[in-house]
Amino acid sequence: MGAIAWSLWQIVAVNDYSEINKANWDERAPAHAASPGYAIDRFLADPEFLSDVVRFDLPLLGDIRGLRGVHLQCHIGTDTISLARLGASMTGVDFSGPAVRQARALAAQTGADATFVESDVYEAADAVGSGQFDLVFTGIGALCWLPSIERWARVVASLLRPGGRLFIREGHPMLWSLGDSRPDGLLVVEYPYFERDEPMIFDEAGTYVSTDVVFKHTLTHEWNHGLGEIITALLGSGLTITGLTEHDSVPWEALPGQMTLLSSGEWRLTDRPWRLPHSYTLQAVKAS
């Protein structure tokens, strides 16, 4: 997701959503790897460098040394490799072949303890093995691509070993429900807060990092999921919620022209940021 305007909302059939989204991400993966926004040069130059997302997560993530982790919807692997640099043995899963190839190249160049597997997130347990992981990690901008949060929660539970932990930091569903930035600065709910059967369709020419690439695949199909729906899905899959923290910042300029860039790399509403939960961290464990 990125600092771009959502220009179109239509109701359509779900059937082809995965292929449409995959074409979009396949095209963007090499552009993202070449963009300063993903800081590939810093990963190569500094063996202790971590992504802004993972640095933000550190206080709640804690010590993960020696854990076996899987990062769902890992894209080009910068967060996955950051987790490996913290001492975990990581597996990244993504449905985009070009993204996985970029991630594998970065892992090889940096010597990170990270492997990458091409798979749809809903098929992740078949791709990497059930009950194998101490940690399931999911980062910003992942859940909006999934039509069923209940199915996702079942996948998470199947991946975790007994006693294993889910760690997710995501854009807040209240933020996802807001319309485009307005000159008057009002925050207006325009898109669904709750999961719907029908996707939202967005037609966006650009992407969320700086690039001169002109993209051909501009359509995406997306879904929002209410915070209660996410928690209920995890509880229904047999996990126990151990933590929920809402944050007043997010790692991208979600509302262009209405946010201030912080020294941490996070963005926050310039005017009365306490009006809106920007993101959240949710943690859960599987019974021992």
Segment roles from a protein language model:
Residues 126-136:
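A short acidic, Gly/Pro-enriched loop at the edge of an enzyme's catalytic core
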Residues 150-165:
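A short glycine-rich, Lys/Arg-flanked "PGG" loop and its adjoining helix->strand segment in the class I
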Residues 165-208:
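Conserved class I S-adenosyl-L-methionine
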Residues 170-185, 213-229:
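Acceptor-substrate binding/catalytic loop of class I
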